[in-house]
Swiss-Prot record:
Belongs to the universal ribosomal protein uS15 family. It comes from Mesorhizobium japonicum (strain LMG 29417 / CECT 9101 / MAFF 303099) (Mesorhizobium loti (strain MAFF 303099)). Part of the 30S ribosomal subunit. Forms a bridge to the 50S subunit in the 70S ribosome, contacting the 23S rRNA. PROSITE patterns: RIBOSOMAL_S15. CDD domains: Ribosomal_S15p_S13e. It holds the Pfam family Ribosomal_S15. This is Small ribosomal subunit protein uS15. GO terms for cellular component: cytosolic small ribosomal subunit. One of the primary rRNA binding proteins, it binds directly to 16S rRNA where it helps nucleate assembly of the platform of the 30S subunit by binding and bridging several RNA helices of the 16S rRNA. The lineage of its organism: Bacteria, Pseudomonadati, Pseudomonadota, Alphaproteobacteria, Hyphomicrobiales. The gene is rpsO.
Length: 89
């Protein structure tokens, strides 16, 4: 259900803008996208889990806010991130 520490480190390594980067919007969006993907898979088996669905909506909203921020600050980084993650927009 949740992502492991190893998977988080992989994502940080892949999307980091500098060595040791853990808080850039790219890293945060990548980790949120992984959590969203895991929850989406969870809902295939547990269709009536509305408490988790509310959490999913919060994660999607948080990711959207970070993407809007990144687009406002640096459109090139935004476009690169969207392509890497395969998000629609």
């Amino acid at each position: 259900m949740s992502i492991t520490a190893e998977r988080k480190k992989e994502l940080m390594g892949e999307f980091a803008t500098a060595k040791g980067d853990t808080g850039s919007p790219e890293v945060q969006v990548a980790i949120l996208s992984e959590r969203i993907k895991n929850l989406t898979d969870h809902f295939k088996d547990h269709k009536k889990d509305n408490h988790s669905r509310r959490g999913l909506l919060a994660l999607v909203s948080q990711r959207r806010s970070l993407l809007d921020y990144l687009k406002r600050k640096d459109d090139v980084r935004y476009q690169t991130l969207i392509e890497k993650l395969g998000l629609r927009r």
